[in-house]
Amino acid sequence: AKEVIHLTDKVGTEIVGLQLSELTDQQKDELALLIAERVVVFFRDQKLSPQAQWDLGDYYGNIEVHPQAPHVTGLPGATVIWNDYKIKQGLDLNFNNINFGNWDSVRHPAIGNNVWHTDLVHERQPAGYTHLHLDAIPETGGDTMWISNYAAYDKLSDEFKKFLDGKKAVYVSAHSYLNRKDPLGGPKKVERIHPLVRTHPATGWKYLAVNRVMTTRILGLSPIESDMVLNFLFDVCEKNADIQVRFKWTNTKPGYGTSAIWDNRVSQHRNVWDHEGK
């Protein structure tokens, strides 16, 4: 790399002078550890096709195929989140069972991407790395923000850490799904129980596994106690600017885009919806 720029002390690094499509296996391994440590890593001026993006994800493990998101034909897991992409790019996409095309759901702060969240927390093994590549970027606005849940945990007192360690919480899916055992019962949210504090398998660092949208209650506490503790933890994450990074996407030359790759397990993210019509 020509340059490695740490955007903040706790979270966010930009790599200059490398093409993701040309990384050696050793570089891919080093990048994986860097993402685990820095939470999110950015690459501008990337010549990256959907196939090359998919291949990089496939190197790291099984690619998550979202059941409700459109994907590039032949590349399950190469999700498209821009509802005009098929028209603009001429790609053949699968839009079956898709609600991402309804941008009211994105703009609405209660259910959309402009509220802090972690993806797929309801799964037995929540998604590891997420790779977002943008080929079209508005002239202004559309920033994306990340929180380091490592740093959020580190802000807690030792006594409070002891209180939280071993506690489990209930996590709910962002979307509703049909139960194949009861298809006539209608779509329902999926709930899963996970530890509230977890340890990253690569770094060995503890992190706080909460987000305001999908962490609903702590087991073993009364509803009032659970709400009080969770709201405090949400505030620790959301109100401490020193554990956050805000990334500004910038236009590059035609045919090139910008990539962000983050560790979904140890982070929260949100967009800033100020670019409608741009």
Region spans (language model):
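Fe(II)/2-oxoglutarate oxygenase catalytic core
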Residues: 2-261, 265-278
